[in-house]
């Protein structure tokens, strides 16, 4: 049932603002004949309710720590956000900047989707469903900080996250995962506002979706409020937002019925989604609204006056909060100092000393070594918030004394309990939203949180769009991906991620790390914490040898290094990750046959690429020595470093780990034969050094054997 219409407030100025706003949107889209006008025109009443009456923010200090967060999940409607930033007094959002929308201006602050680099934009949105998932992360961040640091009379963190979604967002997988999870957690500091215009790119929404959205949210433990005339009724939307703010124990959906392209010739038509109306259509609407049809890009002074009190109000918010924090620090010196460090985005100064240096000498899976790093760091570093997609039993990240971030009212059948002060999250089987939520945590305030996720490596493919968005936004998280390569063994090809390495190695602003033993795990984990960007660790389930005195904590941080040297080498072997073992054993056989063999360990291509030219040349010796990479992944990407590869060129197989390596020819005896032949071929024809040779044959085992 819809919320009863609220008593009118400021109807005349609301109406003037909405009319002028719609015309301004149309002018901006028309100037370069491109953009998304329709939803921005239909959502103006929502914007007035949020920016004028509800949200707590500062236009003079857009990064104020305790501000309410606003996320436009339907990012194509960015003109809506830019225009309200302009009206509310954000200094960087000038009329000139507004006019740069869809222009050729390299320095435009009005890109086609909101981007985190620009002021007052919390997260980059565009791929639908990401923004609402990020919003859950932002809400978790606030809940966690409040539970850890708030004291009676000192609510130093009490902000709300507001997120606008459209019909399309609510059809995307990560959104559905996040809606379910937010309801489960009872995040009452999250308010999602649904721009329900029932129109999509291809027509009306019912061509593909006829579900009851409100019923779905209620089933997911959301408080649901419905507003009938969302295109015009500012007062009722304000009332709905007030009710959302009063709700305890549940997030709120405000289902606002709007009209795409309101009052224009393409009202309620899919053409309003992403097309310019045309000069004649704009002229007709301006005349209908009582405006001068020849006047473009114009807000009446009364509209600016209506929003003019917002900067001063924001200054007051910031001043009062600073005074509160100052008193808080005096009242709680130790906790206050920690809180101030979190606000600055600082890790404890001693964090490196927390990482274990007593590394194993016996065969150990790299996932086990990584687990030791995470546990040691998380135990005493409050910035760390870690979790898994229902694989905690396998990845085993919870540290001694860890508390679960959980709805405090939840009583689980298995006895697991927690509250909002916990820092270990059970995400359920929701890999995509797990990583998108990690982005929200990272974006809350850079450095305040260090999100660490974990799952089987194969399942990070479900989360690829979220990891790409982390890279795009330069957000920092660490992802612990276990059961890599064909080492997942009996689980078979569905769980053996033989092709994913190429994706992550190619991703800009992203570090893919595949350590070969515990020393490399130690060095690379330290490096990952230092880096400002996201990292994915590719880790073995099976045990691998340790190489004290050969593998190097410090050299691993350089991405690639000389593991075993040889003067005037006949062949170089690159070992990566768990296949470093194959390189070492193959080298022994080749040496026994009279070849001089150099071994390179290569756990991270991007780190290696960042080294000096001199260092890279000293390690690789390109053009001088034939170089074979040995890795149980596809070869794509290794052409830049090696001249040949013993790699995977087919999907995996369900066999015990030793047998699956044998099945695909990953045994030193077989590899050494291929490499020996390759060395002879290169000596006979040196031109082979200048093309990449695949030394792997597809398995020829009898498929008909019963």
UniProtKB/Swiss-Prot annotation:
InterPro entries reported for this sequence: THDP-binding, Transketo_C/PFOR_II, Transketolase-like_C_2, Transketolase-like_Pyr-bd, Transketolase_BS, Transketolase_CS, Transketolase_fam, Transketolase_N
Positions contributing to Mg(2+) binding: 167, 197, 199
UniProt cofactor note: Binds 1 Mg(2+) ion per subunit. Can also utilize other divalent metal cations, such as Ca(2+), Mn(2+) and Co(2+). Binds 1 thiamine pyrophosphate per subunit.
Residue(s) at site: Important for catalytic activity: 36, 273
Taxonomic superkingdom: Eukaryota
Primary localisation category: other
GO cellular component assignments: cytosol; nucleus; peroxisome
Keywords assigned by UniProt, alphabetized: Magnesium, Metal-binding, Methanol utilization, Peroxisome, Thiamine pyrophosphate, Transferase
Motif (Microbody targeting signal): 704-706
Pfam families named in the record: Transket_pyr, Transketolase_C_1, Transketolase_N
GO BP annotations, alphabetical order: methanol metabolic process; pentose-phosphate shunt
Family matches, as PANTHER family: TRANSKETOLASE, TRANSKETOLASE-LIKE PYRIMIDINE-BINDING DOMAIN-CONTAINING PROTEIN-RELATED
Stated name of the protein: Dihydroxyacetone synthase
Lineage: Eukaryota, Fungi, Dikarya, Ascomycota, Saccharomycotina
